[in-house]
């Protein structure tokens, strides 16, 4: 499907969960001849990341309102109006055929600006429960898509765009059948780490002994303390790294993952075809719980919510999964994934632009 001469503006910012899926769709459409620009904020990760991908970025000034106090709330309408005006000027100059909102604060004023100029708005909600910005924008959007069922009552479920190196991994049957020895447990806390996993997993390792080998991603600044915790638990052999640059290689190595359940993490684990023990971050709206629930329902994962998390709960869960069980769960995870999510989102953008 050629997009020769068509123009897209992607609105996404703040976290990797918004920015990476946006980049996947942008690259897919650029390969079809689309011109793509980005709308973001200058003080968040998109400011550095997007230009590295060869995409020009425009900035508006906007930030979140949660927990900002009464003064910020009083000033909010003026700040939103100014951000809307900035976005409108940017879009008037660029003249996109369609805008794609992938979440983050920037999508709110950006979506309103597009709508006020008669530019179609396409939305993609990455999480199992819709964010505030997308709830508002859904009322004016031409098309709304969701990664998981339940964020919006009638939106099409298209999955989350996932990195191509994860999609290219061999299927679970090819990867896991015939594996022997200790079960390989990948612990992922995200770039900031997950303190609860850093505290719990060394004790889990002590309980499980030689039956597991662990690769633990501790997050920024925590590697030494986590290594020390494993050593003090009599388990110094396990590997601890601050970050994992090649997640596809880590997924290929693993038999099972213990992690938070951010939207992109859940989608990557499903695409990789891996069983998981999810410990959702305690958001007020239980966003990460709803992200993980479809995989638990599919028999591919177990959720332990943080108040119920203990060394015994994790150790008993992992010890209760035989290699046969892990392979079955891995196959169910892969079956529940939507590997062509990038194409599905890109196709809707193209369809709306042609309408």
Curated annotation (Swiss-Prot):
It is a peripheral membrane protein. It catalyses: di-trans,octa-cis-undecaprenyl diphospho-N-acetyl-alpha-D-muramoyl-L-alanyl-D-glutamyl-meso-2,6-diaminopimeloyl-D-alanyl-D-alanine + UDP-N-acetyl-alpha-D-glucosamine = di-trans,octa-cis-undecaprenyl diphospho-[N-acetyl-alpha-D-glucosaminyl-(1->4)]-N-acetyl-alpha-D-muramoyl-L-alanyl-D-glutamyl-meso-2,6-diaminopimeloyl-D-alanyl-D-alanine + UDP + H(+). One of its GO terms (cellular component) is plasma membrane. Changing residue 288 to A: 114-fold decrease in kcat. It is found in: Cell inner membrane. Keywords: Cell cycle, Cell division, Cell inner membrane, Cell membrane, Cell shape, Cell wall biogenesis/degradation, Glycosyltransferase, Membrane, Peptidoglycan synthesis, Transferase. The keyword Cell division applies. Its EC number is 2.4.1.227. Disruption phenotype: Inactivation of the gene rapidly inhibits peptidoglycan synthesis in exponentially growing cells. UDP-N-acetyl-alpha-D-glucosamine binds at residues 15-17, 127, 163, 191, 244, 263-268, 287-288. Pathway: Cell wall biogenesis; peptidoglycan biosynthesis. One of its GO terms (biological process) is cell division. Changing residue 127 to A: 64-fold decrease in kcat. GO terms for molecular function: UDP-N-acetyl-D-glucosamine:N-acetylmuramoyl-L-alanyl-D-glutamyl-meso-2,6-diaminopimelyl-D-alanyl-D-alanine-diphosphoundecaprenol 4-beta-N-acetylglucosaminlytransferase activity; undecaprenyldiphospho-muramoylpentapeptide beta-N-acetylglucosaminyltransferase activity. Cell wall formation. Catalyzes the transfer of a GlcNAc subunit on undecaprenyl-pyrophosphoryl-MurNAc-pentapeptide (lipid intermediate I) to form undecaprenyl-pyrophosphoryl-MurNAc-(pentapeptide)GlcNAc (lipid intermediate II). Strongly prefers UDP to CDP, GDP, ADP and TDP. HAMAP family: MurG. Belongs to the glycosyltransferase 28 family. MurG subfamily. NCBIfam families: murG (TIGR01133). Homodimer. Associates with MreB and MraY. This is UDP-N-acetylglucosamine--N-acetylmuramyl-(pentapeptide) pyrophosphoryl-undecaprenol N-acetylglucosamine transferase. It comes from Escherichia coli (strain K12).
């Amino acid at each position: 499907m050629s997009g020769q001469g068509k123009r897209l503006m992607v609105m996404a910012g703040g976290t990797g969960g918004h920015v990476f899926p946006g980049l996947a769709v942008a690259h897919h459409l650029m390969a079809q001849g689309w011109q793509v620009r980005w709308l973001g904020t200058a003080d968040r990760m998109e400011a550095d990341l997007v230009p590295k991908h060869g995409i020009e970025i425009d900035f508006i000034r906007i930030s979140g309102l949660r927990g900002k106090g009464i003064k910020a709330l009083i000033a909010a309408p003026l700040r939103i109006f100014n951000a809307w005006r900035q976005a409108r000027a940017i879009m008037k100059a660029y003249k996109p055929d369609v805008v794609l909102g992938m979440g983050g604060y920037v999508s709110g004023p950006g979506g309103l600006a597009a709508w006020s100029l008669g530019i179609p708005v396409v939305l993609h909600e990455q999480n199992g429960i819709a964010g505030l910005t997308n709830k508002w924008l859904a009322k004016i959007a031409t098309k709304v898509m969701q990664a998981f069922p339940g964020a919006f009552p009638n939106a099409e479920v298209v999955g989350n765009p996932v990195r191509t190196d994860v999609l290219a991994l061999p299927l679970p049957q090819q990867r896991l059948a015939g594996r022997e020895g200790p079960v390989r447990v990948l612990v992922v806390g995200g770039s900031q780490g997950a303190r609860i996993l850093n505290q719990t997993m060394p004790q889990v390792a002590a309980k499980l002994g030689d039956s597991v080998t662990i690769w633990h991603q501790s997050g920024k600044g925590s590697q030494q303390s986590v290594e020390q915790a494993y050593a003090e638990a009599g388990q110094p052999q396990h590997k601890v790294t601050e970050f994992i640059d090649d997640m596809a290689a880590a997924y290929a190595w693993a038999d099972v993952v213990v992690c938070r359940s951010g939207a992109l993490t859940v989608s990557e684990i499903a695409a990789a075809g891996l069983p998981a023990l999810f410990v959702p971050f305690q958001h007020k709206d239980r966003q990460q719980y709803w992200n993980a629930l479809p995989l638990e329902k599919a028999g591919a994962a177990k959720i332990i919510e943080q108040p119920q998390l203990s060394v015994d709960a994790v150790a008993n869960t992992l010890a209760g999964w035989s290699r046969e069980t892990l392979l079955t769960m891995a196959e169910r995870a892969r079956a529940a994934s939507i590997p062509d999510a990038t194409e599905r989102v890109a196709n809707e953008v193209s369809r709306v632009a042609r309408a």
